[in-house]
Amino acid sequence: MLEAAILYTLPLAVISFFCGLLIAVIVAVIRTLPSPNLPLKLLQALCRVYISIIRGTPMLVQIFIIFYGLPEVGITLEPFPTAIIAFSINIGAYAAETVRASIIAIPKGQWEASYAIGMNYRQAFIRTIMPQALRISVPSLSNTFISTVKDTSLASLVLVTELFRVAQNITAANYEFILIYSEAALIYWIFCFVLSFLQDRLEIRLSRHL
């Protein structure tokens, strides 16, 4: 089971998280842009709808729609990329609100100081605002990643041979449910414990620079 956790569970969580984070940053940036024109307003409305739908529906339903629904329109994916897409879309919706809140939390004086030294909006955002916003969002994003590690067990329902799927296969053969599932739970806990420790260290290190 440890091999499955290393080869499938962790890569699934890591790839999904960073793809989701990319989606989150794009959505958050769009939602925080000034909206003087109709196309941008429509794009912002679309982002709000995306967040509302994803946050308002179970992840399992989202996984099933992608895995079983896409083949109906001629798109067939393997289980692993299906899980990555589903997790990334889900993470993107939740993390987008985290990143957006962090951007809004940056004092307006930071914008004004950037403009005062000759930066335009894009330069101020990339060089001054976004680094601080990501630093502020580290605790919430770290918790999202830890939750993603645990949520990868849902991928077993679309036949991804990650940790929980392997545990199911073993129990189907020997019926040692308590032993096998306890071992799986222990592996999940060890991963999350290590990640929580690293999160604490990272927060302490970042706090020195705030």
Swiss-Prot record:
InterPro entries: AA_ABC_transptr_permease_3TM, ArtM/GltK/GlnP/TcyL/YhdX-like, MetI-like, MetI-like_sf. This is Probable amino-acid ABC transporter permease protein HI_0179. It is found in: Cell inner membrane. One of its GO terms (cellular component) is plasma membrane. GO terms for biological process: L-cystine transport. The lineage of its organism: Bacteria, Pseudomonadati, Pseudomonadota, Gammaproteobacteria, Pasteurellales. Its main location: membrane. The chain crosses the membrane at residues 10-30, 57-77, 79-99, 177-197. Belongs to the binding-protein-dependent transport system permease family. HisMQ subfamily. Probably part of a binding-protein-dependent transport system for an amino acid. Probably responsible for the translocation of the substrate across the membrane. GO terms for molecular function: L-cystine transmembrane transporter activity. Keywords: Amino-acid transport, Cell inner membrane, Cell membrane, Membrane, Transmembrane, Transmembrane helix, Transport. Residues 6-199 form the ABC transmembrane type-1 domain. It is a multi-pass membrane protein.
